[in-house]
């Protein structure tokens, strides 16, 4: 960043790809919902970081209608996480929260994410983005999930994916 300060940018939010799978109660066939959690890019010289993008080229947001028509789930929330990007002269882009409710009797979550412990750094006095968080909401209980792992799910469970914002 010192050699080419006008080319440096704050750290990207993070990568997260939750997978939910099982036997669909409606069809008795296997299903796998593979998702991409979209997040922000870091602030860079002259502009704020873009919001809700994938770090992988040629990948875009999978429409809610596609997920809901192919899988026994419902998307209850899809919104930018306001102020999740790091502050700075040019702020980091925000992450995109997604809450997924399981409509099936059971399923399994395989979760792989980052930035749950170490926030995306800022550059040139820009601040770090907010830490990522993944919640399992079962009834009135909220359980914070680790960034990597496998979790058994039951009908009515809500998974809340809250990616970090990028560095400013």
Model regions and ranges:
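Glycine/proline-enriched, intrinsically flexible loops and inter-domain linkers
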Residues: 1-168
């Amino acid at each position: 960043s010192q050699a080419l300060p006008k080319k440096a940018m704050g750290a990207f939010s993070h990568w997260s790809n939750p997978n939910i799978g099982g036997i669909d109660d409606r069809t008795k066939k296997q299903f796998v919902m593979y998702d991409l959690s979209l997040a922000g890019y870091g602030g860079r010289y002259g502009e704020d970081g873009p919001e809700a993008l994938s770090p992988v080229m040629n990948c875009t947001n999978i429409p809610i209608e596609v997920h809901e028509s192919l899988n026994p789930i419902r998307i209850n929330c899809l919104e930018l996480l306001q102020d999740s990007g790091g502050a700075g002269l040019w702020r980091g882009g925000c992450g995109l929260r997604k809450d997924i409710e399981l409509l099936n009797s059971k399923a399994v979550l395989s979760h792989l994410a980052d930035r749950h412990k170490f926030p995306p750094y800022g550059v040139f006095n820009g601040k770090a983005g907010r830490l990522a968080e993944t919640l399992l909401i079962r009834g009135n209980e909220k359980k914070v999930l680790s960034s990597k792992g496998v979790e058994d799910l039951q009908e009515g469970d809500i998974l809340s994916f809250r990616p970090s914002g990028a560095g400013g």
